[in-house]
From Swiss-Prot:
Species of origin: Pseudomonas phage Pf1 (Bacteriophage Pf1)
Domain of life (superkingdom): Viruses
Protein name, as recorded: 8.6 kDa protein
């Protein structure tokens, strides 16, 4: 059986090395994708954020990855 993990990327040190941290576990890729979409929904879209330099939905979505692992 396969379970799915959602991981978030953080950058460390002067070389900005990537580290991945598990933040959610689900039974299907669709469930995990839905979880990520709920999280990034609070950020404005690129269109809404034209005058702002804050994080957008599109950029926030890029720090997450979903991986399938054998249980």
């Amino acid at each position: 059986m396969t379970k799915y993990l959602v991981e978030i990327c953080t950058f460390h040190g002067p070389t900005r090395q990537r580290r991945w941290h598990r933040v959610h576990q689900g039974g299907s890729r669709v469930e995990c994708q839905r979880w990520v979409e709920e999280l990034v929904a609070v950020f404005p879209t690129e269109e809404e954020a034209r005058r702002s330099f804050g994080l957008t939905r599109e950029r926030a979505r890029q720090v997450y990855r979903i991986r399938g692992v054998r249980a």
